[in-house]
Amino acid sequence: MSTPAYLTKLESIPKEKFLFGPSPISYLPNLTAVLGGKVKLYAKREDCNSGLAYGGNKVRKLEYLVADAKAKGCNTLVSVGGVQSNHTRAVTAVAVASGLKAVTVQEKWVPIDPPLYSETGNILLSRLMGGDVRLNQETFDIRHKKATEDAFKDVEAKGGKPYYIPAGASDHPLGGLGFTNWVVELAKQEKELGVFFDVVIVCSVTGSSHAGTVVGAVAEGRKRKIIGIDASGKPEATRNQVLKIARNTAALLDERLEIKEEDVILDDRFHAGIYGIPDDETIAAMKLAAQTDAFITDPVYEGKSMAGMIRLVKEGAIKEGSNVLYIHLGGQPALNAYSSYFPHA
């Protein structure tokens, strides 16, 4: 059997090697039992995918972007995120590992200021790695930002050659490739495990993890359902961005690959109304996962997608007998900045 065109193209695109290998898949037996046992719950652990500063989904995506940056002779990665951004921590990590510099604009995406919020967690790790961290008062938005443009020009003015990486490594020509390849990786693991995951749950904000997974699922043609859980609080913008990235990624890999609007499923019931702030359902979901399978999530992303998965199972929205795969995108370092939400947890 010949290799599909999209796979041939995907394998031809240069990338760095920042991951240990395939991210592990673990069964969640206790959470499965607590939720009734009618569907089996598993997790694919992007939080365990790399040795670079706690890894995470962004490291997988950045394998392609850093290869592109190096091919273009760039010496400084310039990007943006919130104060507790997993992405900017990952950008700094891959820069250090690649002998590059990193300039990260850390905006006030979350309208709270708990004690030490801008001193602990992800931003502490970025500073520890020697990143050029620049605090900024701009609020949350997944669009391209002027502050990042200013940082880019500043690097140029000082004689550097910057490479721009948008928030989440998402709205970039190569942003969806990491998670398209994730589906290819998953299919190989399924063959080894003797299981097929009917439903995949993924958190969605800047959109490329969700979009890449959709492209991979459509391309393989195995009727796998990808459910995005919005954590942006701006679901219309997120849905549009996921569809845009998915279509651009598909076009890059195979012009015959069609992504339809209905391929992008985004459940908008669990974002708590705003990016970066957990509600009672988020916190309850985090505690349940932690107290059943010692499965640690964060209050910004994974806590909200965990809340989504738990409610979908409880509602019976997932067909009995299904194997559900939750993508753990990482992000636990941010938990250190949210201790005020967990008094004597």
From Swiss-Prot:
Keywords from the UniProt entry: Hydrolase, Pyridoxal phosphate
GO molecular function: 1-aminocyclopropane-1-carboxylate deaminase activity; D-cysteine desulfhydrase activity; pyridoxal phosphate binding
InterPro entries referenced in this protein's UniProt entry, alphabetically: ACCD_DCysDesulf, ACP_carboxylate_deaminase, TrpB-like_PALP, TrpB-like_PALP_sf
Keyword Mitochondrion: no
Catalyzed reaction equations: 1-aminocyclopropane-1-carboxylate + H2O = 2-oxobutanoate + NH4(+)
Residues carrying N6-(pyridoxal phosphate)lysine: 58
Listed Pfam families: PALP
Cofactor list: pyridoxal 5'-phosphate
Keyword Thylakoid assigned: no
TM ranges: none
Domain of life: Eukaryota
EC category: hydrolase
Enzyme Commission designation: 3.5.99.7
Residues at the active site: 85 (nucleophile)
Gene Ontology BP term (one): amine catabolic process
Family matches, as NCBIfam families: ACC_deam
UniProt record similarity statement: Belongs to the ACC deaminase/D-cysteine desulfhydrase family.
Function: Catalyzes a cyclopropane ring-opening reaction, the irreversible conversion of 1-aminocyclopropane-1-carboxylate (ACC) to ammonia and alpha-ketobutyrate.
Protein name (Swiss-Prot/TrEMBL): Probable 1-aminocyclopropane-1-carboxylate deaminase
